[in-house]
């Protein structure tokens, strides 16, 4: 069996790790019941469907409420809400390390990296690990690990069209976004707009950021943007990567 390598990258220029840890450890979210009574396992058929969608179209959107379970989704939302009330969430930038640039004309969300240190995060990491192994078995992508962060978009926040990884960088290969917003309506804005990978002027899909829905796409190929939100919008982004060793702190 393949040995999992799960090493989230942390960038001290983006978020103070101890602040994020201290904000959620010991909070009420730790006592939430995560028993997966109604949770469906990640099946081979589901992984087949995901791999087929990525190989044929470069992206797909799926409803994961049944597979992740209401308890886990609620716990993750509570965590990001706690972080949003502290200084643990920082304005997101473009680039990494010394190349990090914060340009509010392009991107206005706030983020906090996950470390897998709480029960909800550990449960989520198991789900991501199943995807990593499943995609490797089906698409031979050679994914070594993943990194993930919470994101908060307040009213008026957006993220203009972009790619998650530049061609030839071979770092981020597959992107996944999980949404944590109940009762989200079209009038609330904040949709993920996905563009044709062969024509970035052509919209090929729009994803409403409702709780339990995920969007998965090839990081180097699929342009996308977050439209302006009209109320606070919570999500979680994950990238499956080729490199084994995280960037130095």
Where are these regions (language model features)?
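Fe(II)/2-oxoglutarate oxygenase catalytic core
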Residues: 1-175, 179-214, 220-249
């Amino acid at each position: 069996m393949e040995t999992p390598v799960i090493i989230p990258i942390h960038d001290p220029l983006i978020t103070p790790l101890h602040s994020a840890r201290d904000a959620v450890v010991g909070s009420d979210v730790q006592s939430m019941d995560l028993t997966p009574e109604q949770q469906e396992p990640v099946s081979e058929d589901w992984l087949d469907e995901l791999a087929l969608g990525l190989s044929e179209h470069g992206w797909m959107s799926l409803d994961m409420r049944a597979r992740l379970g209401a308890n886990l989704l609620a716990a993750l939302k509570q965590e990001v809400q706690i972080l949003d009330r502290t200084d643990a969430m920082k304005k997101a930038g473009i680039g990494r390390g010394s190349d990090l640039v914060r340009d509010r004309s392009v991107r206005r969300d706030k983020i906090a990296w996950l470390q897998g240190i709480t029960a909800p995060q550990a449960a989520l990491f198991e789900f991501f690990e199943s995807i990593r192994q499943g995609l490797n078995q089906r698409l031979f992508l050679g994914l070594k690990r993943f990194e993930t962060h919470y994101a908060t978009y307040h009213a008026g926040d957006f993220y203009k069209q972009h790619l998650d990884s530049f061609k030839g960088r071979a770092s981020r290969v597959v992107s996944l976004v999980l949404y944590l917003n109940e009762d989200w309506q079209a009038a609330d804005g904040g949709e993920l707009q996905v563009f044709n990978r062969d024509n970035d002027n052509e919209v090929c899909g729009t994803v409403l950021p409702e709780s339990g829905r995920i969007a998965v796409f090839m990081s180097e190929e699929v342009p996308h943007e977050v439209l302006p939100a009209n109320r606070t919008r919570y999500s979680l982004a994950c990238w499956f990567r080729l490199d084994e060793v995280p960037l130095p702190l």
